[in-house]
């Protein structure tokens, strides 16, 4: 798509049963590569805490770090849509805090949508942000920022609770919603009745879209544990290690720089 991707495009994709792919990305150069691959929607996730910054959990990434990463992605995204996570601690306290964080994220980065975790309990935050003119993506099911309350990584099976959460975020004005680690049959049922696009991660293949962390599809770093819902499409970790090793050996043997690399 040469013109900017719009929220109406995603609604049309849902109406026409056209699935679409979202990827996380955190920097300019990687984003450019994914634009060339035809990815139309990017998520600058708080997963950057682990994948890019080396923190032990997503709750450790700061607002300023997310602003820096998101701005870089927007500069590389071209016509693609960019969704930015609001990190833990930047929206939970009050509607006013949520609006400040969301508007600041959009103003400073150019992101098109902000994402936050929670359903019924965050409905007023979603409504306040939406009323302030910022589109919202909700995140339901397994919510990593609340992992301590959820007792770790577990599939979220509560149909009644998830249904109530979906209804709440839709009523609050969310433009899209992520289902994480939700049983496939439940995700399919809720996707069919949900009027906004549903993005799945570990939620079966009946959702309107799929999202994965790009490091997972590329097996980077090599050997890291991958969740069951991940499919590896390339061995980028191994390729990077090989490239760096060959470079090091060439330097040590004075094979690089060769004559063709010298002025």
Swiss-Prot record:
Active site, renumbered: 180 (proton acceptor)
InterPro entries: Pantoate_hydroxy_MeTrfase, Pyrv/PenolPyrv_kinase-like_dom, Pyrv_kinase-like_dom_sf
Record keyword Disulfide bond present: no
Compartments, record wording: Cytoplasm
Co-factor binding comment: Binds 1 Mg(2+) ion per subunit.
Main location per the UniProt record: cytoplasm
UniProt: Mg(2+) binding residues: 46, 85, 117
Pfam families to which the protein is assigned, alphabetical: Pantoate_transf
Pathway: Cofactor biosynthesis; (R)-pantothenate biosynthesis; (R)-pantoate from 3-methyl-2-oxobutanoate: step 1/2
Enzyme Commission numbers on file: 2.1.2.11
Cofactor: Mg(2+)
Enzyme superclass (EC): transferase
GO MF, one example: 3-methyl-2-oxobutanoate hydroxymethyltransferase activity
Superkingdom per UniProt: Bacteria
Record's keyword terms, sorted: Cytoplasm, Magnesium, Metal-binding, Pantothenate biosynthesis, Transferase
Record SUPFAM superfamilies: Phosphoenolpyruvate/pyruvate domain
Positions contributing to 3-methyl-2-oxobutanoate binding: 46-47, 85, 115
GO cellular component terms, A-Z: cytoplasm
Self-association and partners: Homodecamer; pentamer of dimers.
Recorded family membership: Belongs to the PanB family.
PANTHER family for the chain: 3-METHYL-2-OXOBUTANOATE HYDROXYMETHYLTRANSFERASE
NCBIfam families registered for this protein in UniProt: panB, PRK00311.1
Protein name: 3-methyl-2-oxobutanoate hydroxymethyltransferase
Record organism: Corynebacterium diphtheriae (strain ATCC 700971 / NCTC 13129 / Biotype gravis)
């Amino acid at each position: 798509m040469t013109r900017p991707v719009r929220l109406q495009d995603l609604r049309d994709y849902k109406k026409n049963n056209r699935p679409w792919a979202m990827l996380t990305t955190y920097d300019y150069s990687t984003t450019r590569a994914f634009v060339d691959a035809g990815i139309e929607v990017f998520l600058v996730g708080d997963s950057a805490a682990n994948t890019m910054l080396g923190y032990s959990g997503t709750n450790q990434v700061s607002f300023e770090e997310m602003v820096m990463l998101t701005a870089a992605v927007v500069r590389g995204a071209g016509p693609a849509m960019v969704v930015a996570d609001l990190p833990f601690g930047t929206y939970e306290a009050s509607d006013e805090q949520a609006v400040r964080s969301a508007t600041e994220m959009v103003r400073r980065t150019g992101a098109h949508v902000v994402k936050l975790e929670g359903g019924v309990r965050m409905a007023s935050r979603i409504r306040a942000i939406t009323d302030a003119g910022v589109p919202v993506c909700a995140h339901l099911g397994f919510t990593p920022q609340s992992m301590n309350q959820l007792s770790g990584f577990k599939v979220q099976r509560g149909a009644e609770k998830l249904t109530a959460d979906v209804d709440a975020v839709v009523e609050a004005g969310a433009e899209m919603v992520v289902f994480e680690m939700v049983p496939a049959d439940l995700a399919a049922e809720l996707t069919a009745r949900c009027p906004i696009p549903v993005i799945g991660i570990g939620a079966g293949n009946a959702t309107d879209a799929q999202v994965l962390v790009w490091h997972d599809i590329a097996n980077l770093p090599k050997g890291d544990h991958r969740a069951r819902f991940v499919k590896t499409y390339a061995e980028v970790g191994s390729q990077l290690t090989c490239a760096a090793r060959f470079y090091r050996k060439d330097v040590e043997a004075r094979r690089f720089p060769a004559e063709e690399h010298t002025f």
